[in-house]
A protein has these predicted regions:
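Short glycine/threonine-rich catalytic loop with a Thr-x-Gly-x-Asp
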Residues: 6-8, 22-27, 101-106
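Gly/Ser/Thr-rich beta-alpha loop segments that engage phosphate groups in nucleotides
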Residues: 10, 22, 91, 95
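N-terminal small/polar loop signature for handling phosphorylated ligands or for N-terminal nucleophile
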Residues: 1-16
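Ser/Thr/Gly-rich flexible loops in soluble cytosolic domains mediating phosphotransfer, phosphorylation
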Residues: 26-44
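Short, ordered loop/turn segments at secondary-structure junctions
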Residues: 8, 20, 28, 50, ...
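Phosphate-binding and adjacent anionic-ligand microenvironments
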Residues: 38-178
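Short Gly/Thr/Asp-enriched flexible loops that form oxyanion-binding sites at enzyme active sites
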Residues: 12-29, 55-56
Length: 178
């Protein structure tokens, strides 16, 4: 028992457990990555900067190379093509399968792949609940003029003190990992 939801044009997947728990796209990517890497070990798996910090270690643990990239459908799709990665995804729910598919985002296909993975389990709910969960700051958008975003990020890097930060990432905006 699982709930699958699709956006209006069918290119994004939403997942809800039988208990009503939302399985956010970065957690969906964990299942997809483990499955794909079983057939394509050592390959890069692309994810956008909005995904939580739990995804990269999961990809490594399952034999892949995590590759964080900029947010945006076209940007992720271009990176998939550039790298030849078998899988990419965004926190928005866009999942791009190159392995056994055509390299574009298709929510219905992603749903079918998820059902294929879960069909191998005795209890799908147990599989979904076992995925590591994490909290993250939602995307913050500030209205700005052309050129201002990069200047703001530079200024934040100069003036802000991110006490205890493990890493500061500026691939697309500002991401601080602790």
């Amino acid at each position: 028992e699982i709930g699958l939801a699709f956006d209006g044009d069918g290119d994004r997947l939403g997942v809800v457990t039988k208990d009503g728990e939302i399985i956010y796209p970065d957690r969906q990517l964990m299942l997809f990555a483990a499955d794909v890497l079983g057939r394509c070990p050592g390959q890069p798996i692309i994810y956008d900067v909005k995904c939580t910090r739990r995804l990269a270690p999961w990809i490594r643990e399952h034999g892949g190379e995590p590759l964080m990239w900029k947010t945006g459908h076209a940007l992720v799709k271009a990176k998939l093509k550039e790298t030849g990665a078998p899988l990419a995804g965004e926190m928005s729910g866009h999942v791009f399968f190159k392995e056994r598919w055509f390299g574009f985002d298709d929510g219905l296909y992603a749903g079918a792949r998820l059902l294929e993975i879960l069909a191998r389990a005795v209890d799908a709910n147990t599989v979904l609940k076992a995925l590591p969960d994490s909290s993250s700051t939602p995307e913050l958008n500030i209205a700005m003029q052309e050129g201002e975003p990069l200047a703001l990020i530079d200024e934040l890097r100069r003036q802000a003190h991110f006490e205890g930060a493990r890493e500061i990432i500026t691939i697309d905006g500002l991401r601080v990992e602790y």
